[in-house]
């Protein structure tokens, strides 16, 4: 079947439009007073609300997929389920939406790291969507969204200058645990699996290259998280206006 007429396109379009509609709904919700005074913070707040929703849905969905189809933990290339396939399409739609939102809102320069991440994620997910291979790998990758629930909550509190809240202080320790369990551990497991494709000229080799770049980004983000929350005196000083965009 020609790629142009692949039945996954309506799923991707539907997922993308769903997140677009969700953003419109979330924009109508009351905002913290501190956020309302700054257009950039307002945009970022709405962006994070959508991200927070995606993380909750896809994180729980990924756990359910692995519970329903545990062979995805071992047969990463060949294991497949309708639920896992729809999850990958759902998350790809989010990344498409967020990429468009960043570009249209002229936040490309401030959010270029997110764009790089989204492009790599979409490149990896499309292998599962259009060729129905490595769907299990896509589901395992989306375990990271469980960690993102707490990371996004952290960023939302920082935007609102709420670092002194007890919730923020408790959340930073939860973040460490979740980062290890749902970000570092799955990433290490996937990297070990995909190393078998090193030196080949296959789809697995392409995904290995993406995975290694994501590994580097994850390590960099982890070091920033540690500096910002546990060694603030060592964290690089930035203008307060755009600090929340990258930390």
Curated annotation (Swiss-Prot):
Membrane-inserted regions that do not cross the membrane: 124-144
PROSITE patterns: TLC
Secretion signal, residue range per the UniProt entry: 1-27
Residues exposed to the Cytoplasmic side: 68-83, 195-201
Topological category with respect to the lipid bilayer: Multi-pass membrane protein
Keywords: Cell membrane, Membrane, Signal, Transmembrane, Transmembrane helix
BP terms from Gene Ontology: membrane assembly; phospholipid homeostasis; plasma membrane organization; regulation of membrane lipid distribution
InterPro entries xrefs: TLC-dom, TLCD
Record topological domains on the Extracellular side: 28-46, 105-123, 145-173, 223-247
TM spans (from-to): 47-67, 84-104, 174-194, 202-222
Localisation per UniProt entry: Cell membrane
Chain ranges of the TLC domain: 40-234
One GO cellular component term noted in the UniProt record for this chain: plasma membrane
Its biological purpose: Regulates the composition and fluidity of the plasma membrane. Inhibits the incorporation of membrane-fluidizing phospholipids containing omega-3 long-chain polyunsaturated fatty acids (LCPUFA) and thereby promotes membrane rigidity. Does not appear to have any effect on LCPUFA synthesis.
Entries under PANTHER family matching the protein: CT120 PROTEIN, TLC DOMAIN-CONTAINING PROTEIN 1
Protein name: TLC domain-containing protein 1
Annotated source species: Mus musculus (Mouse)
């Amino acid at each position: 079947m020609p790629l142009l007429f692949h039945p996954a396109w309506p799923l991707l379009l539907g997922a993308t439009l769903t997140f677009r509609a969700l953003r419109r709904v979330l924009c109508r919700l009351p905002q913290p007073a501190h956020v309302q005074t700054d257009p950039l913070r307002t945009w970022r707040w709405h962006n994070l609300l959508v991200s927070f929703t995606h993380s909750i849905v896809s994180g729980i969905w990924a756990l359910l997929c692995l519970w329903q189809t545990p062979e995805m933990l071992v047969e990463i290339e060949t294991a497949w389920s309708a639920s896992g396939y729809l999850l990958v399409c759902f998350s790809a739609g989010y990344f498409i939406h967020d990429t468009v939102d960043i570009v249209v809102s002229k936040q490309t320069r401030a959010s270029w790291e997110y764009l790089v991440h989204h492009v790599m994620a979409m490149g990896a997910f499309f292998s599962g969507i259009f060729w129905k291979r490595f769907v299990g790998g896509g589901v395992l990758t989306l375990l990271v969204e469980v960690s993102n629930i707490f990371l996004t909550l952290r960023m939302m509190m920082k935007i609102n200058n709420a670092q002194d809240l007890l919730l923020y202080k408790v959340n930073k320790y939860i973040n460490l645990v979740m980062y290890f369990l749902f970000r570092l551990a799955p990433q290490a497991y996937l990297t070990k699996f995909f190393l078998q494709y090193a030196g080949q000229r296959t789809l697995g080799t392409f995904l290995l290259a993406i995975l290694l770049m994501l590994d580097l980004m994850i390590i960099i983000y982890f070091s920033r998280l540690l500096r910002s929350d546990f060694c603030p005196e060592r964290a690089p000083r930035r203008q307060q206006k755009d600090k929340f965009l990258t930390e």
